[in-house]
């Protein structure tokens, strides 16, 4: 498919970054249109495309799609390039499991509590809430240990064949490990640490802070 691809998203959104990683790994050319869902006027306009006023939204020609997992599945199915969903049913199941774990149990403690309080808030000249960071780290440990077990299984998160799980986790880990406590927690898990050392060197990760326009 050759129609133009645009990601509508907020530059700080981890899920906008998930979508961008998938597009990059699929070798799809795309542009990013900055939309701030926290701005009331922009959020209201965004509801024309997303009834809940969230990001990201993918626009592919006349086709609009919201919800990150739907976007990444579409990107893998609609475009040529490396497969991001394994053919092996057990590997595909592990991929779906890892995504479900990090979305359901990892996003809030890893991103909203640890990263947002330890890294983002000080960068915005706000005080770090140490109690919130501690609570986030405690909850994150269970998530990281679950992901370590999935990585140890050897079907996904190897750093070799990239799947949609790498895209979801890559965006989360990029933020989480910017907090020293997050980086230390990952380093304590040998399989996950090995995966992250390889994943973080990929252009899809190293280019996240340079947003295409």
Give the location of each predicted region:
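GST-like domain detector, emphasizing the conserved glutathione-binding G-site
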Residues: 1-134, 155
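Short, solvent-exposed turn/loop segments enriched in Gly/Ser/Thr/Pro and often Arg
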Residues: 36, 164, 212
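Generic structural signal for individual residues within well-ordered alpha-helical segments
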Residues: 93-96, 168, 193, 206
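GST-like fold's C-terminal all-alpha helical module
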Residues: 104-198
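Substrate-binding/catalytic groove segments of enzymes
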Residues: 179, 206-207
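A late-sequence structural motif
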Residues: 202-203
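Terminal-tail/helix-coil boundary detector
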Residues: 207-213
């Amino acid at each position: 498919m050759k129609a133009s691809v645009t990601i509508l998203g907020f530059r700080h959104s981890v899920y906008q970054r998930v979508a961008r990683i998938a597009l990059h790994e699929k070798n799809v050319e795309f542009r990013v249109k900055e939309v701030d869902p926290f701005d009331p006027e922009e959020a209201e306009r965004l509801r024309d495309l997303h009834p809940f006023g969230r990001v990201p939204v993918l626009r592919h020609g006349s086709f609009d799609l919201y919800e990150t997992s739907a976007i990444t599945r579409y990107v893998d199915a609609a475009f040529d390039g490396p497969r991001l969903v394994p053919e092996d049913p057990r590997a595909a199941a592990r991929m779906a499991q890892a995504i479900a774990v990090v979305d359901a149990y990892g996003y809030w403690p890893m991103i909203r509590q640890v990263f947002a309080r330890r890294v983002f808030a000080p960068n915005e000249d706000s005080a770090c809430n140490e109690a919130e960071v501690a609570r986030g780290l405690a909850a994150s440990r269970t998530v990281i240990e679950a992901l370590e077990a999935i990585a140890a299984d050897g079907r996904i998160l190897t750093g070799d064949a990239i799947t949609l799980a790498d895209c979801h986790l890559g965006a989360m880990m990029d933020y989480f490990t910017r907090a020293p406590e997050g980086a230390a927690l990952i380093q304590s898990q040998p399989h996950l640490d090995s995966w992250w050392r390889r994943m973080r060197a990929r252009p899809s990760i190293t280019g996240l802070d340079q947003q295409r326009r």
